[in-house]
Every structure is written in structure tokens, then in C-alpha cells.
Amino acid sequence: TTGVGLPLDGPSGNVPTPHPAGSPNGYQPPYVAPELVTRDYGPISTMDPWLPANATRTEGNNTFAYIDVARPNGFGTGDVAPTPNGDPDGGIAFDRVYDPLQNPYANDSQRMAAATQLFYDINFLHDWYYDRGFDERSGNAQTSNLGRGGIENDPINAEGQDNSGR
């Protein structure tokens, strides 16, 4: 991440992708070790939290991020939603590390890491665009608009590894 928490392009940071030559030549970008980002909300003037205090999975006011590996489409039996795995300060932590050397479908640890990153990215972008004018009245996706107008109950269902075939 950068100083404001802006997500990096990928596990290689913001180096040229896919590679500087623009054609296959054996270039391998350097791996950037992940860091645990601690924040309750992104770059947003309202300081609305991403998760309720009693959160049990990556589901908040703006998005529900999960891995949709089982039919039917949408979250259900067999799908994976990251659960908190502790925080030494007593808050909520989703401390998941994605291993780029493993298959993304290898195990639930890989899936939880991917969905945790998806949750972070969606929430960060929600907050980033909010203060640039994409608020409730403009159609910003939220479960509760907190009395600020617009249509409620329209959070983003962010499905990683979506099984719908699209």
C-alpha cells in the first residue's frame, strides 16, 4: 500500500506489468512482501467504518466479499467468506497472506486471502470515490445510507472466483 492505503497493482507492487518489454522475454517482477493494513475506514471524510464492531466475516455496509465456489450463484453452502483471525489490540483483523506460488484454488487459506484483498479494494474505492462526489444520492452502494438520501440496501456482492460461468 501507499501512505494513504492505496492498494498496489498486485503482489509485485506497482512495477511495470506485465513486463517492461511488452512481449514475453522471461522478465519476472520482484515480489513485494504483503503488509497487514490496519484501518477502520478508508480515505473518506465521513469516517464511516467498513465493518460493524461485531463482524464475523468480510461483510460490511459497502460490500460483502466472498469466494463463490459452489452453486447456486451467490453466497451459500460451500462458499468461503473470511472470518476474523484475531487482533492483538482487541479489534477485528483479517490477517490473511496470499501465496502467489500456490494455485488460487489450492485451499481455503488462499481463498480467504483473495476475498480479504477484494474486501479491502472494494471498500477503499468506495471511500475514494465518495469524497469525489459519488455519494448516496449519486447511487453509491451501501446497505444503510445513514440518513443521507439515495436508495439503500444495495451493497456490492463482491464474488471472487465466481462460479456462475461469466
Residue ranges: model-predicted function:
Residues T1-R166:
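Extracellular zinc-dependent metalloprotease catalytic-domain scaffold
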